[in-house]
Design a protein with these regions (language model features):
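Short glycine-enriched loops at secondary-structure junctions
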Residues: 49-51, 131, 169
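Short beta-to-alpha loop/turn elements within the nucleotide-binding domains of ABC transporters
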Residues: 38, 57, 98
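Short beta-strands and strand-loop turn motifs
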Residues: 63, 97, 186-190
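FAD-binding core/adjacent interface of flavoenzyme oxidoreductases
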Residues: 1-12, 27, 42, 46, ...
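Glycine-rich active-site loop/strand segments that organize a redox cofactor
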Residues: 31, 45-80
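A short linear boundary/processing microfeature
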Residues: 50, 142, 180-181
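Rossmann-like dinucleotide/flavin-binding elements
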Residues: 2-7, 11-37, 150-191
Length: 191
C-alpha cells in the first residue's frame, strides 16, 4: 500500500488550480503526483450541462495554453475539453478516483494516506476547491429528496414551482434557465 518514491510535491485535487500547480511543478523539475477523488476537473462536470462561464477564456487558461472558444465566454464542454487536452499534453502524473483519507507529518516530510496507498512527499498543495461543500442554510426540510444544492438542468422543472436561494451569478442564471423552461420561479435573497 506504499509508494516507494518520494515526491517533491503532492497535489490534492485535479481541478484547474491543481492542474496549474502540477504543470508548474513539472516545469521546475519537481517530482509530483496529483491525487483526485473523482475525475479530472470533477467539479466542472457537475456544472449545468450547457453552462456558459462568466469569465472570458483568458481568465480560465493554465500553463500558457490558449483556451479557444467559439464564444466570448466559453461553454462548460469547451472548458472541460480544454483542461483534458492540457493534462494530456503535459503528461501529468494524475491519479483519479483516489480519495485522500489523511495527511501526517511535518514541514518537508509528509505522508499522504489515500484509499489506495500512502505517498511520501516533501510538500503538499491542497487544491480541492469548494464545489463539494454547498452553503447549507440549516433550515428544516433542506435534506428532503426534492431539495437540490446544485443546479444541473432546467428541463425537469417545466411547469413546476421552484425556489432558487441566492442572488449571485449562478443563482440568477439558474433562475433564468428555469423560467425559460416554464418553471414558476421564486428567488429568495438575503437582506
Amino acid at each position: 500500500m506504499s509508494e516507494s518514491q518520494q515526491y517533491d510535491v503532492a497535489i490534492v485535487g485535479a481541478g484547474p488550480v491543481g492542474l496549474a500547480c502540477a504543470i508548474e511543478a513539472g516545469r521546475q523539475n519537481l517530482s509530483h503526483i496529483v491525487v483526485e477523488k473523482g475525475s479530472l476537473v470533477n467539479s466542472l462536470i457537475g456544472y449545468p450541462t450547457n453552462m456558459e462561464f462568466f469569465s472570458t477564456p483568458e481568465l480560465l487558461e493554465i500553463g500558457g495554453y490558449p483556451l479557444v472558444s467559439s464564444r466570448y465566454k466559453p461553454l462548460r464542454e469547451e472548458t472541460i475539453d480544454y483542461y483534458h487536452r492540457v493534462a494530456r499534453t503535459e503528461n501529468l502524473n494524475i491519479h483519479l478516483s483516489e480519495k485522500v483519507l489523511r495527511l501526517e507529518g511535518k514541514r518537508g516530510q509528509f505522508t499522504l494516506y489515500t484509499d489506495k496507498k500512502s505517498i511520501q512527499t516533501r510538500n503538499v498543495i491542497v487544491a480541492t476547491g469548494f464545489f463539494d461543500q454547498p452553503n447549507l442554510l440549516n433550515v428544516e426540510g433542506e435534506n428532503l429528496d426534492h431539495v437540490h444544492h446544485y443546479f444541473k438542468e432546467a428541463y425537469a422543472y417545466s411547469g413546476r414551482d421552484v425556489v432558487v436561494v441566492g442572488a449571485k451569478n449562478s443563482a440568477a442564471k439558474a433562475a433564468l434557465l428555469l423560467n425559460r423552461q416554464g418553471a414558476n420561479v421564486t428567488m429568495l435573497i438575503r437582506g
